[in-house]
Amino acid sequence: MSASVAEPPPALSRKAEFKAAKAELLARFKSANHVTPLMHALSRATDDALRSLWQECGLPATLALVAVGGFGRGELSPHSDVDILVLLPDAHASELDERIERFIGMAWDLGLEIGSSVRTVDQCIEEASHDVTVQTSLLEARRIVGSTALFERFMLRYREALDARAFFQAKVLEMRQRHAKFQDTPYSLEPNVKESPGGLRDLQTILWIARAAGFGSSWRELDTRGLITDREARELRRNEGFLKTLRARLHVIAGRRQDILVFDLQTQAAESFGYQPTSAKRASEQLMRRYYWAAKAVTQLATILIQNIEAQLFPATSGVTRVLSPGRFVEKQGMLEIAADDVFERHPDAILEAFLLYEATRGVKGLSARTLRALYNSRDVMNNAWRRDPRNRHTFMQILQQPEGITHAFRLMNQTSVLGRYLLNFRRIVGQMQHDLYHVYTVDQHILMVLRNIRRFAVAEHAHEYPFCSQLIVNFERPWVLYVAALFHDIAKGRGGDHSALGMADARRFCREHGIEGDDAALVVWLVQHHLTMSQVAQKQDTSDPVVIKRFAELVGSERRLTALYLLTVADIRGTSPKVWNTWKGKLLEDLYRATLAVLGGAQPDAHSELKTRQEEALALLRLETVPPDAHRALWDQLDVGYFLRHDAADIAWQTRVLYRHVAADTAIVRARPSPVGDALQVLVYVKDRSDLFAGICAYFDRNGLSVLDARVNTTRHGYALDNFIVTQTEHDVQYRDIANLVEQQLAARLAESAPLPEPSKGRLSRLSRTFPITPRVDLRADERGQYYILSVSANDRPGLLYSIARVLAEHRVGVHAARINTLGERVEDVFMLDGTGLSDNRLQIQVETELLRAIAV
């Protein structure tokens, strides 16, 4: 008896055949990197498969199978949805429904992501009249198989019903709403290649609008129509090709539909384009810069095209409103319009004048398409001679010195690439991503955000946001000096080396070329050099130490420099990420500013005089709260000078009021209150000291989702710990007043236990930290006086990190005197002041450092 091999089921065979054909096309794409042939070939293969299924299901010739959407265009990415319409005649037999369902099911079985609709012609027209999404998908309908007559009747009815003006308005509104979901910027850390501003959807929207208006359905046709130039058409094709290729590569790498350029895939995507890491830039950063440049160009050209199409569909009834610059610029319907197409060629100095007029002229809300196009096509005019022209340098300084509109003008200069062509080093950082785990903007966007933040300090409507900064900038002469410093503080990022030092040289050259002299030039250069210093001192050093304040005051040297650095620092931190700034950091910086200002004003930073002042202020507050006159003495006699220097009068008064009756308490006293500083909880712990106390408190905070911002640890003369913590709960919208009692009860109960310290939890890293891990660093050294040891820790942030550090210190009986927890987005840079007892032993130092590195490792 001979064995026979069973034939595979037809459906299985067809699926395997289709899968093999698709795999061959993808392999060809990987080697040849031509995306258009791939998309067309995938569409043809899908057409063939659907025709075969249609015939197998015995669907009659009176029906039509229609491709719509991207499939209708004949453009399928490797894992795109396949959108189809089964077009029915007005009258059809009910048994057809079963066959249509079978056809759609078999298409799914084939491995296609089918999006299907089954409608008559009348139903299609009715749906399209109510839903612009349906109307859009039908715009590119293409017959695959079935009745040609039915399909042509449908297309005729569709075109008759299509209102080009209404369609334009609906699609532009839809685009604006879509852009708003992405904060109106293409510069997202993880952009959606299809949907983000400047992505493929913007290009498709323009072609849909043009097709609906009868202007053409390709860049070549729009060029022929005069809506774009040859150069613009080439630029659009080039960037469209890049975006399509990037999307296809994302699909191939992920093995599924993947339109978001997530961190996990950025490196692989970059390598697929041939990018290699350098000493200054990761491969992923190079790819992202290419993407941002493409998205920026698409955004700019889309603005021009949409305005041009709008002008054709809605001819203006009024002409020039007023002449703004004779022979150069006019205002037309609220837009700045060039007087002639060759204005910038004949008058290159008019390029910057356009932005000055936009900034200074009330009622002008933007640049017209004609002006934008002329700027776009004047790139060759913006050369070295143009940059050196004294008229342009004067105009640039005028733009910086206007009383309002500066932020908008600089954003527009960047969007049109004029800023990068005037400041060549700025051009180098346009689209430069910063994978440092706390900047969420590209370098150019960060710089403009810092400029915007400084400007907001000076705007009365925003004075409530940062009242102290607004108060300072009102009396700051020539605030444009700060704007120049903002432009240059990070301009040397990505070059390798110290960006502050490199930026100083750029700033010095700019000042020399633009007539900024004397103290103003010196201030600009000094600010660029030291733009990180104030935040480092405030967040990493013991600012209760008079020596620290005196040293910082000597560096600053004057009140004007101090104010300038403070304003730039606040604006800089706020411009990194919405997550990085908090009111606690604001307090640290303001305290440092005020302490330094006092020294610059002649005050001597003397510990004993400061001690006396703090105590007098605290006693005055205690009297207001009706605490008996000498009640404080029992507690204060047990406290050293360091305690009074590290706490302000309000905290001293609060802690004294809580503790003066319980100086020798047998049980832990825990009190919590909403922090007077802002969105945080202040927690006071008073209990007999023990070596694992700090770690135990951190364990409680960790288990309850509370992040420590600051810890001030004190040991009284009679052996009690008097510790003060500032904590936040960032994961949830919490009212700290509501959880204060719970924290008091739970933490007091936890401290009453004698249980050993729990094992630290290895909290999950964020995707950003997993993709861009930083090398953990631990530095342990004696302070300048030899009284304490300073422990500096740098690592990826994760839940449980602080407790992991505290547990290692507790295991080696190393006491924590103070802690500054500095969270910068996805990374931490923490500083601890440790009791020096025992750490003078080099072997113990090495052991502690080794175990800390192991504890904080990813």
From Swiss-Prot:
What are the required cofactors?
Mg(2+)
Keyword field contains RNA-binding: no
Task: List this protein's GO terms for biological process.
Answer: regulation of nitrogen utilization
State the reactions this protein catalyses: [protein-PII]-L-tyrosine + UTP = [protein-PII]-uridylyl-L-tyrosine + diphosphate; [protein-PII]-uridylyl-L-tyrosine + H2O = [protein-PII]-L-tyrosine + UMP + H(+)
Q: Could you tell me which InterPro entries the record lists for this protein? A: ACT-like_dom_sf (IPR045865), ACT_dom (IPR002912), HD/PDEase_dom (IPR003607), HD_domain (IPR006674), NT_sf (IPR043519), PII_UdlTrfase/GS_AdlTrfase (IPR013546), Polymerase_NTP_transf_dom (IPR002934), UTase/UR (IPR010043)
SUPFAM superfamilies assigned: ACT-like (SSF55021), HD-domain/PDEase-like (SSF109604), Nucleotidyltransferase (SSF81301), Nucleotidyltransferase substrate binding subunit/domain (SSF81593)
Q: Which UniProt keywords apply?
A: Hydrolase, Magnesium, Multifunctional enzyme, Nucleotidyltransferase, Repeat, Transferase
Stretches assigned to coiled coil: none
Documented activity regulation: Uridylyltransferase (UTase) activity is inhibited by glutamine, while glutamine activates uridylyl-removing (UR) activity.
Where is the HD domain positioned along the sequence?
A: 443-565
What EC designation does it have? Answer: 2.7.7.59, 3.1.4.-
Q: What does this protein do?
A: Modifies, by uridylylation and deuridylylation, the PII regulatory proteins (GlnB and homologs), in response to the nitrogen status of the cell that GlnD senses through the glutamine level. Under low glutamine levels, catalyzes the conversion of the PII proteins and UTP to PII-UMP and PPi, while under higher glutamine levels, GlnD hydrolyzes PII-UMP to PII and UMP (deuridylylation). Thus, controls uridylylation state and activity of the PII proteins, and plays an important role in the regulation of nitrogen assimilation and metabolism.
For this protein, the record's PANTHER family field holds: BIFUNCTIONAL URIDYLYLTRANSFERASE/URIDYLYL-REMOVING ENZYME, BIFUNCTIONAL URIDYLYLTRANSFERASE_URIDYLYL-REMOVING ENZYME
Its UniProt domain note says:
Has four distinct domains: an N-terminal nucleotidyltransferase (NT) domain responsible for UTase activity, a central HD domain that encodes UR activity, and two C-terminal ACT domains that seem to have a role in glutamine sensing.
Q: Which family does it belong to?
A: Belongs to the GlnD family.
Q: What is this protein called?
A: Bifunctional uridylyltransferase/uridylyl-removing enzyme
